[in-house]
Design a protein with these regions (language model features):
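A short acidic, Gly/Pro-enriched loop at the edge of an enzyme's catalytic core
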Residues: 96-107
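Conserved alpha-helix/loop element of class I SAM-dependent methyltransferases that forms part
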Residues: 17-35
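A short glycine-rich, Lys/Arg-flanked "PGG" loop and its adjoining helix->strand segment in the class I
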Residues: 120-136
Length: 248
């Protein structure tokens, strides 16, 4: 998986997950955000969550991402929404980022649990940053809608069936990490399509504009494989959601 390919394919995205703006704002309501809320968002992408929540609720936040392309967009978005004085973006590898213990009301990692080697490891990485038992941990994670075939497992999780769990299995993994699942906001087919299918158009336009690029052939292969994965497997068998938890 090439970060550059994602930077190209998601150039027109603000939210780098199968989540719609309305769902993002619903999640903010669920979290009871206020101007005193301080959030750490690992793998923040273009910073849309921090920026729109800061604009609406006045939260303060720190976003960490490895992509300078995404962070440039995050800084621009913060300036657009007049919240640059409340949100900070740090370029770095979220998997090795040193989280300040007990410093945050919300700690989040939305759709990037690879930073902890999977869901369990990511939850354990995030927990020390929580300020209190009332603080919230947000994690975005896929789940199996039904029992996947071997072909689906190969196409969507690199052949590792245990990479994801069922929806209830996801609850069990969260609880096994010493957390209580208290809410969730799930993606739907429309959200999946807007996230995935819109990348096809963006990449097609990029390939037309850059036919002689050294990346063209591999990017074309990557996006074609992604189409097959989404249409044959992911859209039907793989769900995605943001799960809201707190310490037991």
């Amino acid at each position: 998986m090439s970060l550059r390919f994602h930077e190209i394919a998601e150039a027109r995205h603000r939210i780098l997950n199968p989540f719609m703006h309305e769902q993002l704002m619903l999640l903010g309501e669920i979290c009871s955000l206020t101007s005193t809320t301080c959030q750490l968002d690992l793998c923040c992408g273009k910073g849309e969550m921090l920026c729109v929540w800061s604009q609406r609720y006045g939260i303060q936040g720190v976003g960490v991402d490895i992509s300078p392309v995404f962070l440039k967009a995050a800084h621009a978005r913060a300036a657009e929404l007049n919240c640059s004085d409340r949100v900070t973006f740090v370029e770095g590898n979220a998997s090795t980022y040193a989280i300040e213990p007990g410093a945050f009301d919300i700690v989040s990692c939305i759709g990037a649990t690879w930073i902890g080697g999977g869901l369990a490891g990511t939850l354990n990485k995030l927990k020390p940053g929580l300020r209190s038992r009332d603080s919230l941990l947000l994690v975005g994670e896929p789940y199996w809608i039904d029992e996947p075939s071997d072909d689906t497992v190969r196409a969507t999780s690199g052949g590792n069936r245990a990479a994801f769990a069922s929806l209830d299995g996801t609850r069990e993994r969260i609880e096994s990490a010493g957390l209580e699942l208290i809410e969730m906001v799930l993606a739907d087919h429309h959200g999946w399509d807007r996230y995935i299918a819109s990348q096809w158009h963006t990449v097609s336009d990029w390939l037309r504009a850059n036919p002689d690029s050294a990346d063209a052939d591999k990017l074309r292969e990557w996006i074609v494989a992604g189409k097959r994965e989404h249409l044959a497997h992911q859209r039907r068998h793989l769900g995605w959601g943001v799960f809201v938890a707190r310490l037991i």
